[in-house]
Amino acid sequence: MAFNMDPKKCPMPTQDPNVRNKNFKEVALGYTAEMAVNEAKRCIGCKNKPCQSGCPVGIDIPEFIAHVAEGDFEAAYQVINRSSSLPAVCGRVCPQESQCEGKCTRGIKNEPVAIGRLERFVADWHRENVHTAPIVPEWNGHKVAIIGAGPAGLTAAGDLAKLGYKVTVYEALHVAGGVLMYGIPEFRLPKAIVQQEIDGLKKMGVDFECNMVIGKVLTIDELMGEYGYEAVFVGSGAGLPRFMNIPGESLKGVYSANEFLTRSNLMKAYLPTSKTPIRTGKKVAVVGGGNVAMDAARSALRLGAESVYIVYRRGMAELPARKEEVEHAEEEGIIFKTLCNPVAIHPDEDGFVHSMTCIEMELGEPDASGRRRPIEKPGSEFELEVDTVIMSLGTSPNPLIRSTTPGLETNKHGCIVTEGDEGKTSRAGVYAGGDAVTGAATVIKAMGAGKAAAKAMDEYIRNK
């Protein structure tokens, strides 16, 4: 096979920015088969597989890419499926540039192989062309419970189902999917794709119980007692938003990004007939610089805002969001106001947001995170005229589970404490992973945690 020594990735086709910023259709259109084969031929098949070491779920990346280069897309899918339960999701939202692609040998002198785009292509090809029913293993006589139907919980459920366990997933919301459904907008991750992944788990025998708030409707003790589950995995995520505690944060028109995106993505609160309407406004400020901030800003634009600002206390180089998401936001007309920070939000005569006072910042010495610490510039305050403010400052786990589970150790941030990488908690038979343990992190890291915990749960039950 002839290698493709093009120094750059095959570009991803996308919707025109001036069209897509008015609709919720997926921005990235995906590779054609010809594009995928050509891009796969850029892989030089390193024997030591550095890219695989950057994948939290350990996909054999050179092997699946070699199959793509040969045009055997189903074989490529089977390689991915050995390690990942959600390839169509990961191919779209994982930060490959800091994981698998960040370790790619081609990336030392040129652009790395577009591993994420190839994973997405393979998953989409399989979904559109292969319609065989999954193999359902024989029941091994044991049953387990999963709390939370997000990426960690879905991964743990899938891996345990493959081992023959009777798996029940308890989800607090009315639909399964967790952050994949409520947090990531349609234009970045179509909900039909997430639903198809969930349907695949159902075909394997996984049961889903929605509208079940564990810690309120049922407790972990009840699940392991009268319900008879031999082990429980807690993958309940981190849905409790953080705020700045500045004057005016309780005004009408101030939202957490979590609330704004949940109501937009799941509850269609932007419709005039909604019982829980969301006020988008014409001039929107999103405070924060991560992927969630980009999602909120780009959603607000699509919901009719005329001007949308990203207000971030560090510079463009320090933005934690994926480079691709920042580029897409800029292309769509999002205005970046960096090196500034809100200090107060002001109301109009009816109690709605009217403006926001910000102060200019400069970067000092690195802080504990390794990034340069933002410092206020005295006397540099200025007014930003806005009518909606969305706070995207991170999230922490909901305290409900820890407050109703005696003996479950948590840290000062409310995250569940686990032992090593297995997800073992201070309670026998209780495992945890994903954002409930780490705080807000990436989809693929949550999946890696779910995968490791599933293996540990299997060993625990077999050795009882």
Task: Describe each model-derived feature in a short phrase.
Residues 169, 173-203, 207-208, 297-344:
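Rossmann-like dinucleotide-binding cores of NAD(P)H-dependent redox enzymes
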Residues 250-281, 366-440:
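FAD-site-proximal beta/loop scaffold in flavoenzymes
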